[in-house]
Design a protein with these regions (language model features):
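DNA breakage-rejoining catalytic core of tyrosine-based enzymes
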Residues: 21-50, 105-125, 142
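N-terminal DNA-binding recognition helix of tyrosine site-specific recombinases/integrases
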Residues: 1-32, 74-76, 170
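Conserved tyrosine-mediated DNA breakage-rejoining catalytic core shared by Y-recombinases
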Residues: 81-131
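Major-groove DNA-contacting interfaces characterized by cationic-aromatic clusters
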Residues: 30-35, 120-170
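Short, basic (Lys/Arg/His-rich) helix/loop patches that form interaction surfaces
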Residues: 143-146, 166-211
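Short, polar N-cap/turn motifs at the start of nucleic acid-interacting alpha helices
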Residues: 86-90, 185, 204-222
Length: 222
């Protein structure tokens, strides 16, 4: 079965964040045009991401890949997220993502004019519910600093970069066994590009997108 056919016959895979009917055919045409320009990032469309998530039945694996898709986080940023970074009960649910540099300096003061963290709104209610269920069913883990004795919260996902890549590879292979094939090679960074393109399709201003992506320079977003 082709991927468009798979999505068409799976209503649950339709993206809940789309405010208007998603023109999948037009989006595919635009992406096909972009493929001729090798400097442009490779990305999946929202229904394709949903199809891939379908092949991640493990709860924690699904939640992590869904986090990459819903936040645009780099993999190292997502793997550093702690439970306290998720604010799921606020009027506007959001996650606070710390930069790698800020994590290395243990939360020290950032340079003047620069923000150490970025706040990403979580606009998909299904994803927010998924994270609530995950936190309700698992215990938060802590570690003690050997030098100071300070008790610190550990990341939600205690796995390596390679492990996450293996999860994705297995999901892609499972999809292929069902005849569902993706037009690009899928990696953790694919979801960051997909997040950005999804917001652009939703007419989010590039300056806002720049902030959500954590890019210091607009050229990085462009």
């Amino acid at each position: 079965m082709s991927l468009p056919g798979f999505i068409h016959h799976s209503p649950a895979l339709q993206d809940s964040r789309q405010p208007a009917p998603f023109d999948y055919g037009r989006a595919l045409s635009l992406r096909e045009m972009a493929r001729h320009y090798t400097e442009l990032p490779k990305y999946l469309l929202a229904p394709e991401v949903s199809a891939l998530l379908h092949y991640l039945p493990d709860w924690e694996q699904h939640a992590l890949i869904n986090t990459l898709w819903n936040t645009g986080a780099r993999l190292n940023e997502a793997l550093a997220l702690r439970r306290r970074d998720f604010h799921l009960s606020e009027a506007i649910p959001h996650v606070v993502i710390r930069t790698a540099k800020q994590r290395r300096t243990a939360g020290g003061r950032p340079k003047k004019g620069k923000s150490a963290n970025r706040v990403v709104p979580l606009s998909d209610p299904a994803y927010v519910d998924e994270m609530r269920r995950l936190f309700a069913s698992t215990r938060e883990r802590f570690e003690e600093d050997a030098d100071t004795g300070e008790r610190r919260a550990m990341p939600v996902w205690g796995v390596t970069d390679r492990t996450v890549r293996n999860w994705i590879e297995r999901a892609v292979s499972a999809a292929e066994r069902d005849g569902v094939r993706f037009s690009i090679a899928v990696s953790p960074h694919t979801f960051r590009h997909s997040f950005a393109m999804h917001l652009l399709y939703g007419h989010v201003h590039p300056k806002v997108l720049q902030g959500l992506m954590g890019h210091e320079k607009s050229e990085s977003t462009e």
